[in-house]
Amino acid sequence: MQPKHSAIVAGLTLALSFGAVSAPAPAAAEEPTPGVASDATDIDKGLYTQQSFSGVLRSVQGVSFVNVTPEMKYFTKYESHGNYNQGFSYGDGYNALGYYQFDRRWSLIPFMKQAYNYNPEKYSMLKDAIDRGNEISNTSNAMYENGQLTELGHIAQDAFQGAYNTDPVEFSALQDAYAYNSYYAVTEAWLKSGLGIDISGRADCVKGMVWSITNMCGTGGCRDFFRWANLSNDMSDREFVTALSNSVVNNVATKYASQPQYHEGWKNRYRNELKDCL
């Protein structure tokens, strides 16, 4: 586990160039249940310049861009094989797209709207999916049937991958920004205000596990796991991630009793995530 760098280096840059500052985007609605566990094992080390600092850089056109270290994003190998252009797949029940597996029932359309509003001309291909967002988000409308994507599945996936192919670097950064601000940042703030737990100075892998649990369970659904972990500011980073992993492993079957087919997958994932961090 590598220690977090505490200072922003002067002249911190990305492979992106930003303009005037505006207000950050609001957080997304939470998912009430986690997505299907993935058995992905590979990780992409990043499509744009990585720095040692993880956090918000600046806000542009309603998007609070961030820089996130590979250490903090370690968990994405269990989400998408570390693929910013990930399409619908069996592992997520054909419900999610992208690096952080934005679920079409919850966060996919809000993310597309944010990317489209950031640059409507460049990301015009997202408009078709946004216009049919209510249908795409409707759980009764399948994205995959009879061995192939449905019409709606094609509309959503083609729009997403078309946007990625238009500007892989920027569209990847947009995914990072949305996921960080809508999931990780919400839980970091709640841990401090709700439980008195400050993780701002902890190792990025600790933050990554917090993000992982939030990404899987939603900003509301994750909170039980943090409560059950009996966290303390006096814990070492090693003790902290061990408590988090054990909380998921020991309680996920009870919390999500209606989804027994995924219990062992979730338990194994967080056992492996603990190994990643240690």
Residues covered by each model-derived region:
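Hydrophobic helical h-region of N-terminal Sec-dependent signal peptides
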Residues: 8-16
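Cysteine-nucleophile amide-bond enzymes
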Residues: 12, 25, 30
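C-terminal segment of classical bacterial N-terminal signal peptides
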Residues: 17-25
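Intrinsically disordered, low-complexity serine/threonine-rich segments
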Residues: 9, 20-21, 75
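Bacterial Sec-dependent N-terminal signal peptides
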Residues: 1-9
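Cell-wall polysaccharide-cleaving catalytic domain and substrate-binding groove, primarily
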Residues: 28-197, 205-278
